[in-house]
Each structure stands twice: as C-alpha cells, then as structure tokens.
Amino acid sequence: MLGFRQTATAIVRPVGTIGYARRCYHPKVIDHYTNPRNVGTLDKKLTNVGTGLVGAPACGDVMRLQIQVDDSTGVIENVKFKTFGCGSAIASSSYMTELVRGKTLADAEKIKNTEIARELSLPPVKLHCSMLAEDAIKAAIKDYRSKRKATELR
C-alpha cells in the first residue's frame, strides 16, 4: 500500500512514485523533468515573439512554447515553455527548447516528434508528448509569421 508524503514543493505524491519513475523512464527524461530547461514566458505582445499553445484532450497535457526570433536573420534567439502534464510532456518541452535555440525557423520546422521520442527513449504510450512538442513549435512559428506579416502590412 502506498502512503502519502508532502514534498518540499508542496505537491502531494504517493510515496514510491519517484522510484517507480526512475525505473520506467530513461535517465534523459528524468533529467529534463527534474531539471527542466528554459521554463518561463516571453512577452507575447512583442512582434518577434511567437506563441504556440497545444493540448492533448486524451490525457490533459497542455504545452505553451514561445520563441523569440531575430527578425533580420530568422534565427530563434530565445525560447521558453510552460507545460502542465506528465514527466514525459515536461521532458519533451524542455528538450525541444534546447533543440530549437539557435536554429533558423526553417530548420526548427523540420523537427519531428520521432527525433524527440528517440532522444528521450519515450515508450510508445508516451509518444503523444513528443507530438505535442512538435505541434507547439510549429504553432509558435506560425504565430510569429502571422504577427510579422501583420506588422509588414501596416
């Protein structure tokens, strides 16, 4: 029988779940989940910031990924995310932010969920998390381009 304990972050978890996760998830997932990179937000009002917000109704994961682009070069200078979901969703978001920083929009658009899933060794039941990350970067790029187009039309 699992007991409950309160962790330092005031989240109540069944005792033993972290040990279970460590046995079931690849160390890269554990690393990105426990030490997520680039968590935060960018000012969505800026014309060089694109925001992608996606969700998976089946499991309740929600992912927001934001990119800040150098308008003159089309290179992603900064990237932030906030994800509400399982460890695989958080790890996929965190890994995606590392992957796209410094890439051109064209190169970032080419990233497929299979690349994320392979790098993190996600099990088949967690592939939707890597799909969310792919959808989020594409949505952020689309948002950035629509903002830029609107600015150019003025």
Swiss-Prot record:
Similarity annotation: Belongs to the NifU family.
Gene Ontology CC, one term: cytoplasm
The keyword Magnesium is assigned to this record: no
Protein name: Iron sulfur cluster assembly protein 1, mitochondrial
Species in which this protein is naturally found: Eremothecium gossypii (strain ATCC 10895 / CBS 109.51 / FGSC 9923 / NRRL Y-1056) (Yeast)
Listed PANTHER family: IRON-SULFUR CLUSTER ASSEMBLY ENZYME NIFU HOMOLOG (PTHR10093)
Subcellular location: Mitochondrion matrix
Keywords annotated in UniProt: 2Fe-2S, Iron, Iron-sulfur, Metal-binding, Mitochondrion, Transit peptide
Biological or metabolic pathway of the protein: Cofactor biosynthesis; iron-sulfur cluster biosynthesis
Cofactor(s) the protein needs: [2Fe-2S] cluster
